[in-house]
């Protein structure tokens, strides 16, 4: 295998950058548009709005080409009551978008905010409270302007924009970009902190290849900001990756990242460094899935459950995972074996899918009882089991299975006969669901 030099990587990375770097014209149009929006907000916003800030990747020249998302935060004084914050934020957001003949709607997080479309631009106008670093938040989004200020300050005299874009595109290619609960991957803010820490895309990957779960990262800037000594003991987190938030040391920026996605990042960082290719940046996860599916399939089964209206993905996906894990426990208790499981939700339906290695079993099974020398236990066991015998050191018995086919088990689930055994979350109820045989719904 030929030894690689920096040019082997740079040629590929420059090709990718040509695809993902916004043009100067695109940047200029975005700047003109954001200036117009902020100027209009200043015209109509009144006390108690402290200031108006553009945040997010477009504010820091860290966005990908054709990313026209604009995030505007309205910072309110801490004394502002929540109703005033909510009502003012919604009023200002709607009025601004209406002024530019856009389309607006209300999104819901901890409190509602206005989203909209104006021409080709996507716009969020979000109210929050003005707080200081490490000060207790009042609403969940209060840190965001502080993140923006920290990154802009830290980027001075550093040209990191392209490295951030490469990391985002690499993670998108692997299907692990996004901190929503569906993806359980890397947020944009986390990407920027990692590039800031390691100084570049290749430097980051060179370190990542040696990572293990529970890796902990503290940015050098944190020690300077808070005048901390290197031996300072930070709060412990039980997460797959820990990256301390520079504006709130009690928060792990990587908390949403699950262990499997961290391990994908480690594995494919090694793969890229050993054999660099543009392939990693463009739908690589789908190519892997398609390749793995060129094989003999197991027994496929999908539950189709109606999705309630107005329930966001960050609520639906944890609940799908919860019900599926509860069903998985029942599956194993009845000796069926699955190769994999997956969940996915579209606008109207929640899909819980399994691929079974064993979906049909004989009528009989062996029930293992206590050791033969456990007299009280043995007496109780043979009293309740007619066909008993000794196997090894235990008394055992043949029992007739309740379920010899996985489909029958699932029919009892959807008919509500196992309600007392399965944990039902609030919004994902398997009763009256449709059972689809021969179907496995992949996430998209």
UniProtKB/Swiss-Prot annotation:
Disulphide-bridged cysteine pairs: none
Keyword hit for tRNA processing: yes
Domain of life of the organism encoding this protein: Archaea
UniProt: ATP binding residues: 57, 60, 147, 168, 177
Residue positions binding Mg(2+): 69, 71, 124
Pfam families per the UniProt record, alphabetical: CAA_C (PF21133), NTP_transf_2 (PF01909), tRNA_NucTransf2 (PF09249)
GO MF term list: ATP binding; CCA tRNA nucleotidyltransferase activity; magnesium ion binding; tRNA binding
Names of the cofactor(s): Mg(2+)
Listed SUPFAM superfamilies: Nucleotidyltransferase (SSF81301), PAP/Archaeal CCA-adding enzyme, C-terminal domain (SSF55003), PAP/OAS1 substrate-binding domain (SSF81631)
Reactions that this protein is recorded to catalyse: a tRNA precursor + 2 CTP + ATP = a tRNA with a 3' CCA end + 3 diphosphate; a tRNA with a 3' CCA end + 2 CTP + ATP = a tRNA with a 3' CCACCA end + 3 diphosphate
Residues annotated for CTP binding in this entry: 57, 60, 147, 168, 177
EC number, UniProt record: 2.7.7.72
Biological processes per GO annotation: RNA repair; tRNA 3'-terminal CCA addition
Key words, A-Z: ATP-binding, Magnesium, Metal-binding, Nucleotide-binding, Nucleotidyltransferase, RNA repair, RNA-binding, Transferase, tRNA processing
Entry-linked Gene3D superfamilies: Beta Polymerase, domain 2, CCA tRNA nucleotidyltransferase, domain 2, Poly(A) polymerase predicted RNA binding domain
Other observations noted: A single active site specifically recognizes both ATP and CTP and is responsible for their addition.
Family the entry assigns: Belongs to the tRNA nucleotidyltransferase/poly(A) polymerase family. Archaeal CCA-adding enzyme subfamily.
Subunit structure comment from the entry: Homodimer.
Known role: Catalyzes the addition and repair of the essential 3'-terminal CCA sequence in tRNAs without using a nucleic acid template. Adds these three nucleotides in the order of C, C, and A to the tRNA nucleotide-73, using CTP and ATP as substrates and producing inorganic pyrophosphate. tRNA 3'-terminal CCA addition is required both for tRNA processing and repair. Also involved in tRNA surveillance by mediating tandem CCA addition to generate a CCACCA at the 3' terminus of unstable tRNAs. While stable tRNAs receive only 3'-terminal CCA, unstable tRNAs are marked with CCACCA and rapidly degraded.
Protein name per its UniProtKB record: CCA-adding enzyme
